Regions:
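Segments of small-molecule ligand-sensing domains
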Residues: 290-300, 311-371
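Extracellular/periplasmic Venus flytrap/periplasmic-binding protein
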Residues: 81, 124-126, 133-235, 273-283
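Bacterial N-terminal signal peptides that target proteins for export
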Residues: 1-9
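Periplasmic-binding protein-like
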Residues: 86-98, 118-120, 161-164, 211-222, ...
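Sec/Tat signal peptide C-region and signal peptidase I cleavage site
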Residues: 17-23
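Beta-alpha junction/loop-to-helix N-cap segments that form part of ligand/metal-binding clefts
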Residues: 41-45, 55-129, 138, 194-200, ...
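Extracytoplasmic "Venus flytrap"
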Residues: 29-50, 70-77, 99-101, 163-171, ...
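Extracellular/periplasmic periplasmic-binding protein-like sensory domains
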Residues: 232-304, 318, 373-378, 382-387
Length: 387
C-alpha cells in the first residue's frame, strides 16, 4: 500500500517529468566579436541577443533557450572555428557575426553543419547569392544606400568624396552609391583604402586639394571612421558634413570619442536616448537597462530582433515537430511580423526585402534622427562638422 505522502511525491514527480517534456531547453550558439576591431559593434549585438533570451525565457513558458557564446576576436578563421565548436556542442542554430568578411566563411561553416545562421552584421550582396538555404539576415546594403541617398537629396548635395574600405560590403555600398549619385548629376570622387591603413591624412589631403566636395562619405568600419575624422579634424577640408554608415551614430562612439563625433552623421534606426511607444519596445528597453544599466542603442536593437525571430521560429518548429528534422529554416521563412526595425520577412535567399534605415546625427552627446525628414526627431545641423 502506497502512503498518501508517497503518492503525492510520485504525482509531483510525474508532473515535473511531464512539464520537462514540454519545457525543453534549446541551445543556441552565439559567434560574435567581443574583442578586436569589431568589438564595439559585436558587444552591442551580443547585449541585444542576451536581452532577447531573457525576455523569451520569461514569456514563452513552454520552451527555453540557452546561449553559448564564443568570441571570434574579429577574425574570419576564428569565426569558422567558433561555429565548428558550437556545432560540436549540439546547438540548434547560430546567431551573431559582424562584418561580411567574417560572416561569409562563418555561415559557410554553419551550412556544412546544416545549421541555420541568423545575422544582422553582414550586408554584402554576395552573402545572399550563394544559394544557402540556412542563411538569414534582417538587413542589407540597399537599406543603407537608400538612407544615405535620401539624406543627400534632402540637403541638396552637389559633390561627394567617397572614402571606402576595400572589404566586400563597404566596396559594394560605395560603388552603388556612386552609381546612384552620378545618375542624379552629383559629382563623385572615389578613394579606396586598404583595411590595414591607419594614417588617413594623405587621402583627406587629396580630397581637400583636388575634390573640394560638399560632403565626405565614409563607407568603412569603426576604427576607420576614427582615423578619417581625426585626419579631417587636423587638415580641415572645406566640407559641409562628415557622413558614414553602420556603427557610427551610436552612443558608444559618442562616449569613446567625444571630440570627434559632434555633428557627424551615420545610419541609425533610433535616436539616443530612445523612448519606445510599443509594449514590445518598452519591455526590450526596460529589460536591457536592468541587464546592462544603460540606455539601448540601435546595435542592441538589431541584436534583439534577429535573436527573437530565431527563438520564435525554434519554438514553432519544436511545437510542430520539424525542429529535429531540419525544419527550422522552413519555419523561419514563414516569418512575417512587425518588429522594432519594421516589418521583417525572408525571401528565398534569406534576405529581408522590407529593410530600410534612417540617418542619425551626433548632437550634444545625443543621436538625433535627421533623415528622412518625415521621421526626424530633430533638425539637422548642416553645415555641421566636428571642428
Amino acid at each position: 500500500v502506497i502512503s498518501k505522502f508517497k503518492r503525492t511525491v510520485l504525482i509531483a514527480a510525474a508532473m515535473a517529468a511531464a512539464a520537462q517534456v514540454h519545457a525543453e531547453e534549446f541551445t543556441v550558439g552565439v559567434q560574435i566579436a567581443l574583442t578586436g576591431a569589431m568589438a564595439r559593434s559585436g558587444t552591442g549585438f551580443s547585449e541585444g541577443i542576451q536581452t532577447a533570451a531573457e525576455i523569451f525565457n520569461r514569456s514563452n513558458g513552454k520552451h527555453k533557450v540557452k546561449l553559448v557564446t564564443i568570441d571570434d576576436e574579429s577574425n574570419p578563421a576564428k569565426a569558422v572555428s567558433a561555429v565548428e565548436k558550437l556545432a560540436s556542442q549540439g546547438v540548434v542554430a547560430i546567431v551573431g557575426g559582424f562584418g561580411s568578411n567574417i560572416i561569409g566563411p562563418a555561415s559557410d561553416a554553419a551550412a556544412k553543419q546544416n545549421l541555420v545562421y541568423m545575422t544582422a552584421g553582414g550586408v554584402d550582396n554576395d552573402l545572399t547569392r550563394r544559394g544557402l538555404k540556412n542563411f538569414f539576415r534582417i538587413n542589407n546594403t540597399p537599406g543603407y544606400e537608400k538612407a544615405v541617398l535620401t539624406l543627400f537629396d534632402e540637403v541638396g548635395v552637389k559633390s561627394v568624396s567617397i572614402v571606402y574600405s576595400t572589404k566586400e560590403a563597404t566596396t559594394d555600398l560605395a560603388k552603388n552609391v556612386q552609381k546612384a549619385l552620378e545618375a542624379r548629376g552629383v559629382k563623385v570622387g572615389m578613394h579606396a583604402f586598404d583595411p590595414a591603413i591607419t594614417d588617413f591624412k594623405p587621402v583627406v589631403n587629396k580630397i581637400k586639394l583636388q575634390d573640394k566636395p560638399d560632403v565626405i562619405l565614409m563607407s568603412a568600419y569603426e576604427n576607420d571612421y576614427v582615423g578619417i575624422i581625426r585626419a579631417a579634424k587636423v587638415l580641415k577640408p572645406e566640407v559641409k558634413a562628415m557622413v558614414g554608415v553602420w556603427s557610427l551614430a551610436t552612443a558608444k562612439m559618442a562616449k569613446d570619442f567625444p571630440d570627434l563625433m559632434p555633428n557627424v552623421i551615420g545610419t541609425s534606426l533610433l535616436p539616443f536616448p530612445v523612448e519606445y511607444k510599443t509594449p514590445e519596445g518598452k519591455e526590450f528597453a526596460d529589460t536591457y537597462k536592468k541587464l546592462f544599466n544603460k540606455e539601448v542603442d540601435y546595435l542592441a536593437q538589431f541584436g534583439y530582433v534577429k535573436a527573437m525571430l530565431l527563438f520564435e521560429a525554434i519554438a514553432r518548429a519544436a511545437d510542430n515537430g520539424s525542429l529535429k528534422k531540419g525544419g527550422l529554416a522552413d519555419e523561419l521563412r514563414k516569418t512575417d511580423r512587425q518588429t522594432l526595425i519594421g516589418r521583417v520577412m525572408f525571401d528565398a535567399n534569406g534576405d529581408n526585402p522590407n529593410f530600410r534605415h534612417r540617418m542619425g546625427q551626433h548632437q550634444n552627446g545625443k543621436v538625433v534622427i535627421v533623415s528622412p525628414k518625415s521621421e526626424a526627431t530633430g533638425p539637422i545641423v548642416y553645415p555641421g562638422l566636428p571642428w
